[in-house]
Design a protein with these regions (language model features):
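Conserved PLP-enzyme active-site core in the AAT-like
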Residues: 1-27, 50-68, 72-272, 292, ...
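Conserved C-terminal alpha-helix-loop-beta "cap" of PLP-dependent enzymes
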Residues: 3, 294-372
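Generic N-terminal amphipathic, Lys/Arg-enriched alpha-helix
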Residues: 11-21, 30-39, 315-320
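Phosphate-binding loop/pocket of nucleotide- and phosphate-handling active sites
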Residues: 110, 382-383
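A common structural junction motif
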Residues: 248-249, 338-345, 375-382
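Conserved PLP-dependent catalytic core of the aminotransferase class-I/II
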Residues: 59, 273-307
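N-terminal alpha-helical segment of soluble enzymes
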Residues: 38-46
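Glycine-rich phosphate/diphosphate-binding loops and the adjacent beta-loop-alpha structural elements
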Residues: 271-277, 355-356, 360
Length: 383
């Protein structure tokens, strides 16, 4: 029996995105097999982390790499690394707030600020703040002049963070200029690119531009273990990340990465880089064409190509708009009926009357299931 049936859990057809709440992505057999193989033996975790990092660094054309416990943990560990380096005394003082018996925060010796774009903030930046740093925001709705970034840098600046999203980047200091400013002041620049795969070139694009670190989710575009993340960048900062990370009893102790996840992410990177990404892109285009054909004769329904995808990735999605007055059913009622079925169908709403279907997370045959279920709902009203 399927484990989810035994537990009474409905499975989900995920036409939404590589969302954590839905399980991220589906691991290919190669990744599952690698994890199962890793589970059969005891190993030295520190040694395994080092070797896996070396292999991933080679695959991704980077100086060094580290496997974290998800992308949020990557944010925390990267911030910690920028503050402590390999200084054990500083490591003991994280997080940066008064703590009896730990020495507390000493502003004269500890960097405590991170620079971010005001219109680049995301809901996950708590993972940076939990180290105890404060954010210095730059820019506004009209953009960010480079000198504003430079003027924000002080002796307290630990790092400059970019939360990558191509749809917002016109409001930010361009990467190349920001990297030049950061290097001038010897401040690390870090790019959180958790969902920015595809394109696969992003695994080395940011660091080749000069970013000190780039962070990715292991369980989104890479199709690795959901509880894994990938950090690539300079050897010195990767060493400082490992210094703060598990199994050491400091700020990263609770962010453990098992031997299965370590080996699984290596297998995922190998698998991902071996895929035909042009063919995958074409398959997403074909889905838009398919839905357009399926719904072309249904009054009150229109289909459009939406681009880019939800986090600015260069992938098309299918946007379907519903005329509630003509159909006699609202978009939200349609979404509720999709959620009520078995399996659940989870797609994103957009605007007042539209939905978006993301092909990145659909398995073979599920495109047709979604189309059939939508037609079934619409035909129950008037067909």
């Amino acid at each position: 029996m399927n484990i989810y049936k035994r537990l009474g859990i409905r499975t989900v057809i995920n036409g939404n995105a590589t969302l954590t709440r839905l399980g991220g992505s589906i691991m290919p057999p190669e990744v599952v097999a690698a994890m199962a193989d890793a589970s059969k033996h005891f190993v030295d975790i520190i040694e395994l982390q080092k070797r896996v990092g070396e292999e991933i660094a080679k695959l991704t054309h980077n100086e060094a790499a580290y496997v974290s416990c998800g992308a949020a943990a990557a944010l925390t560990l990267s911030t910690a690394a920028c503050i402590t380096g390999l200084d054990a005394t500083k490591r003991e003082k994280l997080p940066l707030h008064p703590s009896p018996g730990r020495g507390g925060f000493q502003p004269s010796t500890m960097k405590s600020e991170v620079i971010v774009h005001r219109h680049g903030r995301v809901g996950y930046d708590f993972a940076v703040r939990q180290v105890g740093v404060s954010f210095v925001e730059i820019g506004d709705e009209n953009g960010t002049p480079p000198d504003e970034l430079e003027n924000a840098i002080t002796e307290k600046t630990a790092a400059i963070f970019y939360f990558a999203n191509p749809s917002r980047e016109h409001l930010w200091v361009p990467y190349e200029q920001a990297i030049s400013i950061a290097k001038k002041h010897d401040v690390p620049l870090i790019v959180d690119a958790a969902a920015q795969l595809p394109p696969p070139e992003n695994l080395w694009r940011f660091t080749q531009m000069g970013a000190d670190l780039a962070l990715f989710s292991g369980g989104k575009g890479l199709h690795g273990p959901q509880s894994s993340g990938l950090i690539v960048g300079t050897k010195s900062l990767i060493e400082a990340i490992a210094f703060n990370g598990p199994p050491h009893p400091f700020i990263g102790r609770g962010m453990k990465v098992g031997k299965e996840e370590l080996v699984g992410l290596l297998a995922a990177v190998e698998w991902y880089l071996g895929q035909d990404h042009e063919q995958l892109q074409q398959s997403y285009e074909d889905q838009v064409t398919y839905y357009t054909e399926v719904f072309k004769d249904i009054q009150g329904v229109t289909v459009h190509r939406s681009f880019p995808s939800e986090a600015g990735q260069p992938m098309p999605r299918t946007e379907i708009r519903f005329d509630a007055e003509e159909l006699g059913i609202t978009r939200d009622e349609i979404l509720q009926q999709l959620q009520a079925g078995n399996p659940v169908i989870d797609i994103a709403g957009t605007g007042a009357n539209g939905v978006l279907i993301n092909g990145q997370t659909l398995r073979p045959g599920e495109v047709e299931i979604i189309a059939h279920r939508l037609k079934e709902i619409l035909c129950s009203i008037d067909c």
